[in-house]
């Protein structure tokens, strides 16, 4: 859980991150020529600097904070909140300040991590007393999102923002570089950005962790295969494993989806469950039961009192299912449909018992993240883990 320190050069800011932001806007406008995006302001939700790490002539902090700190003065004219507010470290204070500063502004677009942005927008609704966001910001039309999968949050955003003119675009802007943009709103895949100062290589996930894995150059990748992404950049990274797993959906042009994290998976019994499986399973269970998931995490139970093994899921709902058992059954069924390894281990309950679903109390994950000093910014709830460390902490708080 320690911070990672990634070099961010001025050239990298200009030729990678800001260029990616410009291209995201350009692609959106190309797809929506009647857009009035520039009639109002952009609410950009970022992280903060970390003054405890500062040394002479250097600034350490979340990438999003560094981007705000160094943003072009012209772009700064159309951005809210003010810089002092944007860089506040205390997320609860920042959330309240942002809501109060922006409620009376003409916001046309928002950018940030879906989970933390939802928290800010919820505060806006509380302070305004309105039912839907377009009652506060009637001209809102776009959410540029990234950092975590949008699927678990989509329904909540659609309920919060009823406007038929609302659009969503996924971006892949990591601390290490700006890697992808969703250039086609009808396709969830992102276009790999080849000219942002990065060189891409991939390690097949079935070889990841070996001493000498195969490293595939970009021109050698295959579609529908899970890879760990390896990058070298003009900012100083050399064959760096960024920690995300991707699957290419096309190689002409190169388009991909993020399927998970190299450390966030469950393979305690050979089931090879990845985050993409989890997202699909939860989406299906929500569809079947009318539920909405806010946060979740899962880990294996290696052996219970009866000598049985299973997966244990801790789920916080923004809208609870009518029947929790049916939700768990639907999730388990869908995981077997999309993951043959999981299906094999679940066969006749020989290796894996049906999954156990535990309902989290409201606000549990936010309280846990706050306790760990990980509230807001670019911090993410770990979704899947072979270790029970995180889920045990959460279960203790959930009593």
Predicted ranges, named:
Residues 21-73, 85:
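Conserved AMP-binding loop of ANL adenylate-forming enzymes
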Residues 12, 16-20, 37, 93, ...:
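Residues forming well-ordered secondary-structure scaffolds
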Residues 66-399:
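Active-site glycine/GP-rich loop and adjacent strand/helix microenvironment
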Residues 1-22, 29-32:
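Conserved AMP-binding A3 loop
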Residues 6-7, 55, 122:
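Short, solvent-exposed loop/turn and secondary-structure capping segments
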């Amino acid at each position: 859980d320690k911070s990672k320190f990634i070099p961010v050069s001025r050239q990298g800011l200009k030729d990678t991150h800001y260029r990616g932001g410009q291209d995201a806007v350009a692609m959106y406008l190309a797809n929506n020529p009647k857009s009035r995006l520039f009639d109002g302001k952009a609410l950009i939700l970022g992280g903060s600097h970390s003054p405890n790490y500062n040394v002479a002539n250097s600034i350490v902090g979340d990438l999003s904070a560094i981007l705000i700190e160094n943003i072009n003065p012209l772009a700064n004219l159309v951005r809210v909140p003010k810089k002092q507010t944007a860089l506040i470290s205390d997320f609860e204070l920042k959330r309240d300040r942002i809501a109060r500063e922006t409620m009376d502004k003409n916001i046309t677009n928002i950018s940030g991590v879906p989970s933390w942005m939802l928290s800010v927008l919820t505060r806006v609704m509380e302070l305004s007393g309105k039912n839907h966001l377009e009652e506060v910001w009637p001209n809102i039309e776009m959410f540029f999102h990234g950092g975590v999968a949008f699927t678990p949050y989509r329904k909540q955003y659609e309920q919060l923002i009823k406007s038929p003119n609302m659009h969503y675009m996924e971006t892949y802007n990591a601390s290490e570089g700006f890697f992808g943009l969703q250039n086609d709103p009808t396709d969830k895949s992102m276009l790999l950005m080849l000219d942002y100062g990065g060189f891409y290589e991939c390690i097949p996930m079935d070889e990841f962790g070996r001493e000498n894995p195969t490293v595939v150059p970009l021109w050698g990748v295959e579609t529908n295969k899970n890879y760990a992404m390896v990058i070298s950049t003009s900012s100083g990274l050399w064959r760096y494993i960024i920690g995300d797993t991707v699957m290419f959906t096309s190689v002409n042009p190169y388009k991909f989806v993020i399927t998970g994290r190299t450390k966030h998976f469950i393979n305690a019994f050979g089931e090879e469950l990845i985050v993409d499986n989890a997202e699909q399973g939860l989406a299906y269970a929500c569809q079947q039961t009318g539920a909405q998931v806010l946060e979740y995490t899962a880990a294996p139970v290696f052996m219970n009192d009866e000598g049985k093994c299973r997966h244990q899921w801790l789920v916080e709902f923004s809208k609870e299912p009518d029947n929790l058992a049916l939700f768990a059954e639907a999730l388990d069924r869908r995981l077997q449909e999309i993951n043959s390894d999981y299906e094999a281990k679940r066969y006749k309950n020989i290796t894996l018992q049906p999954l156990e679903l535990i309902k989290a109390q409201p606000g549990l994950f936010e309280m846990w993240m706050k306790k760990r000093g990980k509230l807001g910014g670019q911090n993410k709830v770990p979704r899947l883990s072979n270790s029970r460390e995180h889920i045990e902490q959460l279960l203790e708080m959930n009593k």
